[in-house]
Regions:
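Conserved N-terminal phosphate-binding loop of PLP-dependent enzymes in the Aspartate aminotransferase
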Residues: 1-124
Length: 124
């Protein structure tokens, strides 16, 4: 009863304590982190570049939205969750928002699950 739908999706929600935390994070960000994020974004985009179900990918860095051809985003979310992967929706898109520090191995594992779900025949 503590968390409401969507509550877990905000890293820095705007109150003074989290804003102070955000300032510390900004002090720690360096070019190496940004280069790693760009490489991870490229990996995500390349993974889905030839996936028929993916119409387009919007966003930047690791905050991405995947527009689907036919599948319903909510159905994909449920199927991913059943496989152990948490993804969100943003209207009719699949919303990806992994931590900036996600390892390449973890990212590839999650992308493989999502790719398998997207390549399954439509159950609807």
């Amino acid at each position: 009863n503590c968390l409401q739908y969507g509550d877990h999706g905000t890293t820095f929600g705007g109150n003074p304590v989290v804003c102070a935390g955000a300032n510390v994070v900004l002090e720690k960000v360096d070019d190496g982190l940004l280069e790693a994020v760009r490489a991870k974004e490229a990996l995500i985009r390349e993974t889905f570049a030839h996936t028929p179900e993916v119409m387009k990918i919007d966003g930047m860095g690791l905050m991405l939205g995947i527009q689907l051809q036919q599948k319903q985003a909510a159905t994909v979310v449920d199927e991913c969750l059943a496989e152990g992967l948490i993804v969100l929706t943003a209207k009719d898109k699949i919303r990806l928002l992994p931590p900036l520090t996600i390892s390449e191995t973890e990212l590839k594992t999650g992308l493989e699950i999502l790719l398998n779900v997207l390549n399954q025949p439509n159950k609807e």
